[in-house]
Amino acid sequence: MPKTILVVDDEPSILRLVRATLEPKGYNVITVDNGMEAISTAKVKQPDLILLDIMMPKMDGNEVRHKLAEDPRTKDIPVAHLSAVGDFNQQLEAYDEGAIDYITKPFAPQDLRQHVADLLDPLKREEMKRERAKKSGKVRTIVEIMRRTDSK
């Protein structure tokens, strides 16, 4: 049975690109363009993975992730962010609040396929969580050094 991936982005071109990248590899790709639809679709379809944009109108990806985490029907679905914002603080916040991965746009199709394959593999996902914890510590150190430097 093919794995189902819910892709949430307000940019139609990103939705088309992700679908064109993943469907040929056998994934069932469901696309929606807003946060409310993402939540209702996740409850009904129970995808194996959610790829979630952060900057969307009405309800941003962070709020969507929080609502998914609060619902017993969706709290265990892994969420990876797709974002054009590569800001350290935003990545750190996403990781701290439960995002399993943070994929920056633009991305190469082969990189997205590899991220998805890793995220759908339970052993690799656990390894990614450990790496994320290490990375969060390093990012915190970098951000703190930058703050100290800026304040001088």
Residue ranges of each PLM-predicted region?
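Receiver (REC) domain active-site loop signature in two-component systems and cognate sites
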Residues: 56
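Short, glycine/charged-rich "phosphate-handling" switch motifs in NTP-dependent
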Residues: 100
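C-terminal output helix
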Residues: 107-117, 128
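Charged docking surfaces used in two-component/phosphorelay signaling
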Residues: 16-24
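CheY-like receiver
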Residues: 121-152
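Active-site beta3 strand of CheY-like receiver
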Residues: 45-51
